[in-house]
């Protein structure tokens, strides 16, 4: 409820309150919402305990509990329009686990990975807790794979010069993409 309130207040301050629909639910149940042009989400890390529901997803593991962040990735993309954009905060090591091939196979069929940006290390107490931002575009419509996927690390937020340089690079990249 708190995150919904913060998001709604932020949307209102930006003048978007009429254009944004907020939903609070088990994010893996069937949602009664229309596909969106953009989805932004911070996926929790861990296992999803409702195996009966998880088996409806291609990113579910054949046995045992599946990774919640894999299932939520799939669910969020399912609710994107063709050519829609997903901006997701994911574990930095999402492609380095022994189960990553499950997600990678699904991603190749459903999205173009357009960017993968590591968040600054000083935001996390432990290296194993690091997160990154992945930007994807759902395949279909006018979607195109970027000629060059934007890969990098977002600099320390306190370093104004490096941050400005990063923002310039990101702006130039996004101008070509959008």
Describe the function of each predicted region:
Residues 42-72:
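Mobile active-site "lid"/loop adjacent to the S-adenosyl-L-methionine
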Residues 44-47, 93-95, 123, 140-141:
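Conserved nucleotide-binding/hydrolysis micro-motifs of P-loop NTPases
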Residues 31, 124-128:
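Short glycine-biased active-site loop of nucleotidyltransferases that positions the nucleotide triphosphate
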Residues 35-37, 113, 131:
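Local beta-strand N-terminus motif with an aromatic residue
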Residues 128-178:
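Flexible, glycine-/basic-rich loop-and-beta segments that form/coincide
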Residues 21-25, 117, 152:
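General small-molecule cofactor/ligand-binding pocket signal
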Residues 1-41, 46, 92:
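Conserved S-adenosyl-L-methionine
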């Amino acid at each position: 409820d708190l995150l919904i309130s913060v998001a709604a207040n932020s949307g209102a301050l930006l003048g978007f309150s009429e254009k944004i629909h907020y939903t609070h639910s088990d994010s893996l149940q069937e949602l009664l919402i229309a596909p969106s042009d953009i989805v932004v989400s911070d996926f929790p890390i861990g296992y999803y305990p409702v195996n009966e529901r998880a088996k409806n997803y291609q990113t579910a593991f054949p046995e045992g509990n599946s990774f919640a962040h894999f299932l939520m990735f799939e669910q969020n993309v399912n609710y994107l329009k063709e050519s829609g954009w997903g901006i997701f905060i994911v574990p930095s090591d999402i492609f380095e686990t022994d189960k990553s091939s499950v997600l990678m196979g699904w991603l190749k069929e459903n999205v173009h990975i357009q960017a993968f940006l590591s968040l600054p290390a000083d935001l996390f107490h432990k290296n194993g807790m690091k997160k990154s931002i992945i930007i994807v575009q759902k395949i279909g419509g006018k979607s195109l794979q970027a000629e060059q996927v934007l890969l990098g690390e977002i600099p320390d937020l306190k370093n104004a010069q490096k941050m400005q340089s990063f923002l310039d690079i990101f702006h130039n990249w996004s101008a070509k993409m959008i």
